[in-house]
Amino acid sequence: MTEAATQPALVIPQLIVGLGNPESKYDQTRHNIGFAAVEALSRSWRISLAENRKFQGEYGEGMAPGGGKIRLLKPLTYMNRSGQSIQAVTSWYKLPPESVLIIYDDMDLPLGKTRLRLSGSAGGHNGMKSAIAHLSTQNFPRLRIGIGKPKGAADNDDSNTVSHVLGRFSSAENQQMSLVLQFVVECIELSLKQGVEKAMNVCNSRTINNSES
């Protein structure tokens, strides 16, 4: 067997999904940072998003950095049914699960941190539980964006958790998250050009602070 034959195939995303909730009352909340990430990609790549009833979400496609075709999706099913929308796209285009990259919020990561992985559990995130159920596997890449924990909250304080994830960032946090989203675009562009595993080395090693420009 040649050395080339033993090299693992690069995982290159073909569909990028941002998780969130529809309705204006959820706009710019911490739980909707996945939506914000896909919107940032849409602006950067000049791919317009439009509501697609068949896909139960806002959908767009175009050419991404690296020259390949890329699809963007914001499920409009509400968070805990996100998998329905994702499955509608993957079934229509016959995309394998490993070609789907899902972006979502993570309270266990501090603000300014991101984590890119090739697979994993839902980690208690209802949107990811739905995605895993509808894709029938955990083996697809995901990018978690840290939103931090509510200040001074006990781990079992569910009401505080809900108000935190459905709350909005402060002015200073918004500035920081703007930089985080720029970094997310860079990480995803690297994953499209060199594969998710290569992008992990960059995405997982930095903390984005307000001092960066």
Swiss-Prot record:
Could you say which enzyme class this protein belongs to? hydrolase
Q: Which Gene3D superfamilies match?
A: Peptidyl-tRNA hydrolase
According to the UniProt entry, its GO molecular function terms are: peptidyl-tRNA hydrolase activity; tRNA binding
- Cross-referenced CDD domains: PTH
Indicate where this protein resides in the cell: Cytoplasm
Q: Which PROSITE patterns match?
A: PEPT_TRNA_HYDROL_1 (PS01195)
The yes or no answer to whether the keyword Hydrolase is present is: yes
**The entry's keywords:** Cytoplasm, Hydrolase, RNA-binding, tRNA-binding
Ranges annotated as spanning the membrane: none
- Residues at the site labelled Discriminates between blocked and unblocked aminoacyl-tRNA: N21
Any one of the GO BP annotations: rescue of stalled ribosome
Keyword Cell membrane assigned:
no
Which sequence ranges form a coiled-coil region, renumbered to this chain?
Answer: none
Among SUPFAM superfamilies, the record links this protein to: Peptidyl-tRNA hydrolase-like
A single GO CC term for this protein reads: cytoplasm
Identify the domain of life. Bacteria
Q: How does it assemble?
A: Monomer.
PANTHER family, alphabetically?
Answer: PEPTIDYL-TRNA HYDROLASE
NCBIfam families found in the cross-reference section: pth
Q: What does the function comment of this entry state?
A: Hydrolyzes ribosome-free peptidyl-tRNAs (with 1 or more amino acids incorporated), which drop off the ribosome during protein synthesis, or as a result of ribosome stalling. Catalyzes the release of premature peptidyl moieties from peptidyl-tRNA molecules trapped in stalled 50S ribosomal subunits, and thus maintains levels of free tRNAs and 50S ribosomes.
| Protein name (database record) | Peptidyl-tRNA hydrolase
Gene transcribed to yield this protein? pth
